Amino acid sequence: GSSAKLNFELEERRRFEDDPDYEIVIGIDLGTTNTVVSFMRQGQIEVIPLDNGSRLLPSVVSVNKNKKFDVGGVAKRQLLFNRDDTFFSIKGFIGRRSKAIDSELLKNYPFKFVVSGEKLQVYSPKLKKKFDCEEISAQILKKVKLESEIFLKKENKKCVITVPAHF
């Protein structure tokens, strides 16, 4: 009964903390507004703190004055003074053909969209470069991977990522 469960949980904790080969699979909910990452420990889902201890990472990417990517709260704060180079709500455009997107909708964003063939891209004035929406979302995933590895004190090689229903 309960002693067998306790022994299993103790064994799992030992493996998690001590065994360098114990693989952790993280789950990432790459949201339009926020991103969350979790993992299972002792049969319970645990959400990993990402952005200065917050469990929600704003799904925002910006190019800072040093021409580097910022992700999360730092990027979101740049919406006030760096609107052309701060990208948000990008997930909804991943995998969609440019023809299927209402061009009037794109005018509501402070950053510039560019149609390149069938693809929709965003333009960074600081970098003078176009990026696929997937590349912007990849910056969020890189941040999540780094933050989760710091928290777990292990390299993450496996993950599950949620995808929108229209995929």
What are these model-predicted stretches?
Residues 1-58, 65-167:
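N-terminal phosphate-binding loop and flanking beta/alpha elements of the actin-like ATPase fold
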